UniProtKB/Swiss-Prot annotation:
GO terms for cellular component: protein-DNA complex. Residues 1-93 form the HTH hxlR-type domain. SUPFAM superfamilies: Winged helix' DNA-binding domain. PANTHER family: TRANSCRIPTIONAL REGULATOR, MARR FAMILY, TRANSCRIPTIONAL REGULATORY PROTEIN. The keyword Transcription applies. GO terms for biological process: regulation of DNA-templated transcription. This is Uncharacterized HTH-type transcriptional regulator MJ0925. One of its GO terms (molecular function) is DNA binding.
Length: 106
């Protein structure tokens, strides 16, 4: 499966950001996404987490998920692409992501 395909799926990038923030159990990720308005079903979240593990972007240790080095680098690239997009046009970046980037990039 292509990494672009996985990253383009609903909720995937938001899941990576939540794990980066230390929200790392299945339930806490689900609750955090729901609170941010990016709710995904329990089934979809399980699928995304499995896909992210398959792509080696995250790893599971017991009941906790953590970013791998590859996952950290992927988020850096995603942030740079969003900054670039915002620079060249009025981007429609999800609010959850804008909050994670901070005002300095807008």
């Amino acid at each position: 499966m292509s990494i672009f395909y996985v990253l383009g799926k609903k909720g995937t990038i938001e899941i990576l950001y939540k794990i980066k923030e230390g929200v790392n159990s299945f339930t806490s990720i689900k609750n955090a996404l729901d609170m941010e308005g990016c709710g995904v079903s329990t089934r979809t979240l399980a699928e995304r987490l499995n896909e992210l593990e398959d792509e080696n972007l995250i790893q599971k240790d017991g009941s906790k998920y953590y970013l791998t080095k590859k996952g950290q680098e992927a988020l850096e690239i995603i942030e740079n692409v969003m900054k670039w997009e915002a620079k060249w046009k009025e981007a429609k970046i999800p609010k959850i992501i804008i909050g994670m980037l901070g005002d300095k990039e807008r």
